[in-house]
């Protein structure tokens, strides 16, 4: 995974710098998201791995599948990635691009998993507290997992806050073992 990120980083950085310079961050994020989804398709992966096809043929097929969703610069990006055999890295490129975009916008995606559904008021309060703690705008994504028994698990980038009953029971069990 780290190797893929290392290979994807220059492409994500170049795409981000281009999109930022032309004030097209949202468009490029959408285009790279589509490209990532297309590259993850099983049929497309077989085509991209086919040794008998040239990089130009792979790029043309890729662009054909995406239709008119790509502007000229995005098509050029696909050609460059194909020439360097990096089309299969598009999911990592897209993820890194979105990370750079979030950093630039001073925002962070936060995944909140709770034992029970959070109402809008609870989500708003949680987002406000997390925003103050993280110093960034928070985009909250809530989900439910009954196996937590109670409480919440919050994930924001590398930060994980486990306030679930299941997590506390696991810590207690670990303490009793030692």
From Swiss-Prot:
The keyword Protein biosynthesis does not apply. It is found in: Cell inner membrane. This is ATP synthase subunit delta. F(1)F(0) ATP synthase produces ATP from ADP in the presence of a proton or sodium gradient. F-type ATPases consist of two structural domains, F(1) containing the extramembraneous catalytic core and F(0) containing the membrane proton channel, linked together by a central stalk and a peripheral stalk. During catalysis, ATP synthesis in the catalytic domain of F(1) is coupled via a rotary mechanism of the central stalk subunits to proton translocation. Keywords: ATP synthesis, Cell inner membrane, Cell membrane, CF(1), Hydrogen ion transport, Ion transport, Membrane, Transport. It comes from Pseudomonas entomophila (strain L48). GO terms for cellular component: plasma membrane; proton-transporting ATP synthase complex. One of its GO terms (molecular function) is proton-transporting ATP synthase activity, rotational mechanism. It is a peripheral membrane protein.
């Amino acid at each position: 995974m780290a190797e893929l990120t290392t290979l994807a980083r220059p492409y994500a950085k170049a795409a981000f710098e281009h999109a930022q310079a032309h004030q097209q961050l949202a468009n490029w994020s959408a285009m790279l998201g589509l490209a990532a989804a297309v590259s993850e398709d099983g049929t497309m992966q077989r085509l991209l791995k086919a040794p008998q096809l040239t990089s130009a043929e792979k790029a043309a097929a890729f662009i054909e599948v995406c239709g008119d969703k790509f502007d000229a610069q995005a098509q050029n990006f696909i050609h460059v990635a194909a020439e360097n055999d990096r089309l299969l890295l598009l999911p990592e490129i897209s993820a890194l691009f979105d990370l750079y975009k979030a950093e630039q916008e001073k925002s962070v995606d936060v995944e909140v998993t709770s034992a029970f559904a959070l109402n809008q008021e609870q989500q708003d309060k949680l987002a406000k507290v997390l925003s103050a703690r993280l110093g960034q705008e928070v985009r909250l994504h809530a989900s439910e997992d009954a196996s937590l028994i109670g409480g919440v698990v919050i994930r924001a980038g590398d930060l994980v806050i486990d306030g679930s009953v299941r997590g506390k029971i696991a810590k207690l069990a670990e303490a009793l073992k030692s």
